[in-house]
Regions:
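Transmembrane transport/permeation module of multi-pass membrane proteins
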Residues: 1-532, 538-542, 548-549, 553, ...
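Intrinsic disorder/low-complexity segments
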Residues: 557-558
């Protein structure tokens, strides 16, 4: 009813309105069927290659317990049962009014109409008819469209608390790792480790590479956790999920990697003095601590930055994961294609890392300039490597129209402010009392510039100009007067429930064709075995010699093989090229005449 009311209001502008269904349960059933179908394909191919032995297995945990069953019959029965549930669930989604969510995708016959609708208030009641730009079809995260609107604020509040706790939970192991740089403190706490620490190789390893390596291990699983948190918040597009996850990851790295490394290095030496000093002395303390951590950040750039770029171009991690999947998970060609999928570039993880290196470059440009060559080398190789990977390796999941740039601009401004505070603290340690107050103008000018850019240029990333929309509409009408937009856009935002149903029908037809091919081959195999047995009995009943009997049997076998291959060729030609393409290899079971399947 809500969608009909909206359609009545916008009849002169919109082309189509596509409702959003709460089909999350249906999608889970489809994924479950895909897993079962994959196992069925695996056992059918296995039996196709060795028809003399039916695949037998147990139904319990990982096939180690439970009753023994025929795997092909077992998975066919489970898929048949699941098909009934899918049909019932699909009918429920299409017929139940509660399954229709108060969300819809509206397509317009012009860019101007879409811009007016998306960027204006539709109702005098501010809580009704909320409109916004829809993400492109590839960018839609359909699962979160079913989340009620009133629960989004609660979810975001709870996730904010969880992120805050996560940041300070990770502070504990990172602080311990950074304290390893102070070997004298470790020797005081654990005197029995002194003989090991005094070894030159161990000492250089602990002071040089271990802190950076341990920090990288701690940060390895973090992007996945932050992406899950962003999904719980309820964002409805993949680009929004990656932007939120990238924002969380940047705050985490700023607090733990940058500030945490600096504070931990000094807090273990002067913990009480640091926390009991007045706030005016904190910039001075940080200004003293940051130059002392330059060596650590040099090793961190080499371990994480340089080695990370080399690992990116070599793709060692995806290569290892692919071979592990190929050994333990891959069963069919479909599994192999999924294992070989390179995925996307992962902006939620890579973008905050680049912003952290940019922060280090700005902070240490004045404090410790010797760190700048490490940063410059990293960005030079990163530009070449990531450019190559984006063009030739990774898949593009969506197009967000530079939606990430406002966040990147804000991070650059924040890095400038941190560098100003650091320089202010460093100058105060050098007793430059007359020149230090002049540095106050630097953060003020930076904040003014940020506000100016935000008010002037940010709307270009958030809104679509009506002038440009009108120009493109007129150009399109002139260059393509016969363009049928409705037929072009009618399935653009079609709910996945319909695509899944079509794929389900296609897979069912393919499964039936595979079963028919296997059954026909099995029937022909039985006929060939029976024919050989009859000919053998006739030969034994005759009065021929033994030598003649063997010669006659060889001729009969050769003729039988030739006849079977002719029949096989005719059968595949009749099924067409699509049927032969589904089979990864010819049916080798025709040569196993000894045992009945």
């Amino acid at each position: 009813m809500v969608i009909d009311e909206y359609t009545d209001r916008k009849t002169n502008l919109n082309l189509d309105v596509q409702a959003v269904y709460n089909a999350n349960r249906y999608a889970k059933l489809v994924k479950k069927k895909e897993r079962l179908q994959n196992w069925l394909d695996y056992y059918q191919l296995k039996f196709e290659r060795h028809p003399g032995k039916r695949p037998i297995g147990r139904t319990g945990c990982l096939g180690f317990c439970g009753r023994e069953v025929d795997q092909i019959d077992y998975y066919r029965a489970r898929i048949s049962e699941l098909d009934k549930k899918l049909a019932s669930e699909r009918q429920r989604v299409l017929n139940d009014p509660k399954a229709v969510m108060p969300v819809a995708f509206v397509t317009f016959d012009s860019r101007w109409g879409a811009a007016v609708c998306a960027q204006t208030q539709q109702s005098k009641n501010p809580t009704q008819w909320l409109t916004d730009w829809a993400p492109e079809p590839r960018d839609v995260y359909w699962q979160n469209l079913a989340i009620p609107f009133f629960s989004l604020s609660i979810r975001k509040f709870l996730i904010s608390i969880a992120v805050f706790a996560l940041v300070f939970f990770y502070m504990i192991p990172i602080a311990f790792v950074q304290s390893l740089a102070n070997l004298e403190g470790i020797e005081k706490v654990a005197p029995f480790l002194r003989p090991v620490i005094d070894v030159p190789v161990v000492k250089s390893f602990l002071q040089g590479f271990l802190p950076g390596l341990a920090l990288k291990i701690f940060l390895y699983i973090l992007p996945t956790v932050l992406m899950i948190m962003s999904k719980v918040e309820g964002y409805v597009s993949l680009s929004s999920l990656e932007r939120r996850a990238a924002s969380k990851y940047y705050y985490f790295m700023l607090v733990n990697v940058f500030l945490g490394s600096i504070i931990a290095g000094t807090a273990f030496e002067q913990l009480n003095a640091f926390f009991h000093q007045p706030p005016s002395q904190i910039p001075r303390t940080i200004g003293v601590a940051i130059p002392m951590k330059a060596t650590f950040f040099m090793t961190y750039i080499m371990v994480d930055g340089w080695a990370g770029i080399a690992n990116e171009i070599l793709r060692v991690k995806p290569l290892v994961i692919y071979h592990l999947k190929n050994m333990f998970i891959v069963k069919t060609e479909r599994d192999r294609e999924r294992a070989m999928d390179p995925g996307s570039i992962g902006l939620a993880e890579n973008l905050p890392s680049l912003q952290l290196y940019f922060l280090l470059g700005l902070v240490y440009a004045v404090v410790t300039p010797i760190l700048l060559p490490f940063i410059i080398i990293f960005f030079a190789f990163a530009f070449l490597v990531y450019r190559h990977q984006i063009i030739n390796v990774y898949n593009q999941e969506y197009e967000s129209a530079a939606a990430f740039w406002p966040q990147v601009h804000s991070r650059i401004i924040a890095s400038l402010l941190i560098s100003h505070v650091t320089l202010f603290g460093l100058m105060s340690t050098m007793k430059a009392a007359y020149s230090t107050p002049l540095l106050i103008f630097l953060p003020l000018l930076t904040i003014w510039f940020h506000k100016y850019c935000k008010s002037r240029f940010e709307p270009a990333f958030r809104k679509y100009p009506l002038e440009e929309a009108m120009e493109k509409d007129n150009l399109e009408r002139t260059s393509e007067p016969n363009l049928n937009l409705k037929s072009y856009l009618q399935n653009a935002y079609l709910h996945p429930i319909f695509h899944m149903f079509e794929q389900q029908q296609q897979e069912q037809q393919r499964e039936e064709k595979v079963e028919v091919r296997i059954d026909k081959a099995q029937q022909h195999h039985h006929r060939q075995v029976e024919k050989e047995e009859e000919e053998e009995e006739e030969s034994k009943s005759s009065q021929a010699t033994t030598h003649y009997y063997h010669h006659h049997h060889e001729q009969t076998t050769t003729t039988t093989h030739h006849h079977y291959h002719q029949h096989e060729h005719m059968s595949h030609s009749h099924m067409g090229p699509s049927d032969t393409a589904d089979s990864p290899s010819p049916p080798h079971f025709v040569y196993h005449y000894g045992v009945d399947p």
